[in-house]
Amino acid sequence: MLKPQIHKPHLVNKLPLGTPFIPSHASIASFSTTSLRTLSVQKCYRRYIRYTSSNIKAIMPDSIGKSIRKKCVVTVQPTISGALTAVTVGLLGTVADSVSDFLGRSFLLELVSSDLDSSGKEKDTVKAYATYDELDKESKLYKYQCEFEVPDDFGEIGAVLVQNERHRDAYVKNIVLDEIVTFTCDSWIHSKFDNPDKRIFFLNKSYLPSETPEGLKSLRQKDLESLRGNGEGERQSFDRIYDYDTYNDIGDPDTDSDMARPVLGGNEHPFPRRCRTGRKMTSTEPWSESRTTLPFYVPRDEDFAEIKQITRGATTLYSVLHGVIPALSSVLKDEDKGFPLFRDIELLYEKGVDIDPPPDSGTLSALPRLVKAITNSTKKVLQFETPRIKHKDSFSWFRDEEFCRQTLAGLNPYSIQLVTEWPLMSKLDPEVYGPAESAITKETVEEEIKGFMTXEEALEQKRLFLLDYHDLLLPYVNKVREIEGTTLYGSRTLMFLTCTGTLRPLAIELTRPPNNGKPQWKHVYTPCWDATDXWLWKLAKAHVLAHDSGYHQLVSHWLRTHCVTEPYIIATNRQLSKMHPIQRLLCPHLRYTMQINGLARLSLINANGIIESSFSPRKYSMQLSSDAYAQKWRFDHEALPADLISRGMAVEDESAPHGIKLTIEDYPFANDGLLLWDAIKQWATAYINHYYPQAKLVESDEELQAWWTEIRTVGHADKKDEPWWPQLKTQQDLIGVVSTIMWVSSGHHSAVNFGQYDFGGYFPNRPTIARTKMPNEDPTFEEWEAFMEKPEDVLLNCFPTQIQATKVMAILDVLSSHSPDEEYIGTSMEASWEAEPAIKSAFEEFCGRLKKLDDIIDSRNRDPILRNRTGAGLVQYQLLKPFSGHGVTGKGVPYSISI
């Protein structure tokens, strides 16, 4: 039996170093702006005494036989202090951990053999204590060292067990033996005082379950079980448990009955599942989980707050939510006050808004782009950068052609669809919602295209396109109209594809369902030359833009990327071992998302949060997202080619470059996206075919099958019986599933996220709410006279209020920003990929394709023929350029949903 032995130490004097361990288990939401002051060990004793790396080693008793000495280095990443934590380092913890270093007991490591012994049992582990050695000045990482005496017959080392002897958890980057054998950890290791279980880390070599070395099989299963939990109790900050729950925590009925919200997830309101936290239920609603207090729970390895730069998205988002928004609310106290003049909107960029910093004003230090100090004053100014849409052309938002162009090359390219049937018909019950047939007629179309062709020819030649928010919004119109300060319609917007390949609008239909004895009201607006109808047309566009903004945020963005991805993350951690090749392929695409989603539930999508207070559906926003999930979401349509085909924006064509032919040739999002999709799929194909050379390996992989089953039946339980779920029997099945997940977390999310400030930062271009009804809907004499007297005032009153606009602008600025340490797709190679030559080569080819894509997009943006992506004053389409600098750049595709 191997026993650790402590040799007589060599005393070495060292200057005290800041501890590499965090002061508390703090998720992102525990951020304070108070600067963290680390208490120096020097206050306890004047000299730091440590053991050299040769002091502590595991030795073999002489009677056992020969052994090999192996040197081990443990690399620990320091945590970020300052604005990232609310708790200063406690003296007790500092002294206790320093004593651990003094005694040479920082980490207990145990090497595990991949082989069984001659009797078929697992071999004894080889143990050693690692103690602090130095701070690497170049990498700024802490090094701990020890030596092992490994028996000659130990066999190949396959895993290492780690126990953290300190009182605080530590983020361990890697463990290296003899500078050759590497265990990539990138994981928080809890203190044994919080959890006595040892952490398990495997070599960088990937194994299918059937190929697992005999000596590691039980550890592989044990490690998975440690991540699943038992579904009971409240999760603690040091836990690594991944489990499922419904969205039963966005309401706050204990504070106010009007803040109660229905549970999302279940037969009544289908929705993907989130990570379970186990908090107690509310006292007023036993089915609703109580609102969280800071910090909120995410599995420990999903919390990157203390190890990423201060400008990491979650940090800055937190700073806006808990620093800027309260400051704005204290200044803009009249919640109903709009902008009296367009000039007042301009001043947001020229002068900004003076704000009183909150008591904990350090949060604002994370926002140098937004918040500027005022000379000789304690006040600060919230000054917005001019968005590109306004900087390039101040009047572009007013033009019809730009209104249409942005459906192809703007922030929400996921809604436009081909018209395939005429007349346009609603699928809603006419007994409840009124006549189903649209008021946009054949004559309307022919009048607008001025005899260029008949309506039948336009339909046959695929010239008619639609934004259709009629059936999704109409059931909410009467309910939303009961809320003061907002209104809603069902809407349809019809567009025509011109001979130059651009779109122009033909008509907008706004509909109000029957209510309180009033019949259905609907009206068709068209581009006009006379003053009155032209202003009605502009107001109708404002309503449609508010609908599109809401759909973009609640469906294209939140639902189809953030929300549906969380079950993928949970299932991947619960069912795929850390040594599984698919786990390692997906890992970079699944980082950071759960932390962002937790913050969204805390302050963005919650009752009376940013979304509910600033978007047209108000308190019904998340129910609308649930309806979209029930009616529209299909996994098999989330791959880009399938999405385009489902909307009629492409047809299958084996002779076309991507296997599909676009209905609109100059569709910037689709053209760039298909190149990125192909690159992702080719990378996934090479990777999967390497590990699964035969189809039977896919079907017989019990971890893989359990993973896919759990995604379908638990993570997306409300869709579990749908016939469209792909099977997982062949390599092609697996390539399709994995490529879709990789695309959604990278390309899809980037396309709908990183242009938010460029397009929405000037809110007349994308208002989030329409506050007033159309002037011609049952007008009073006074209302109509006010419109006729000064229609500009009516438009400004329809736009968001000052507090609504500035809150959203501040949020969009952060959501659109890349951090300096952003991990762009194809720019960093996972250690497990590099360890396998064939995978390393495939990844390098993937990187090469992405670099070509970057150049291709630049070339396309210089082509004057492509009018939908370039032209005088246009914001060129570059959202799918893979690489970017930091800040708000309007380009760059991170691996994952990192903000």
UniProtKB/Swiss-Prot annotation:
Entry keyword set: Chloroplast, Dioxygenase, Fatty acid biosynthesis, Fatty acid metabolism, Iron, Lipid biosynthesis, Lipid metabolism, Metal-binding, Oxidoreductase, Oxylipin biosynthesis, Plastid, Transit peptide
Pfam family, any one: PLAT
The organism's place on the tree of life at top rank: Eukaryota
A cellular component annotation (GO) from this entry: chloroplast
Predominant place of localization: plastid
Gene3D superfamilies noted in UniProt: 3.10.450.60, Lipoxygenase-1, Domain 2 (4.10.375.10), Lipoxygenase-1, Domain 3 (4.10.372.10), Lipoxygenase-1, Domain 5 (1.20.245.10), PLAT/LH2 domain (2.60.60.20)
Protein name (Swiss-Prot/TrEMBL): Lipoxygenase 2, chloroplastic
Native source species: Tanacetum cinerariifolium (Dalmatian daisy)
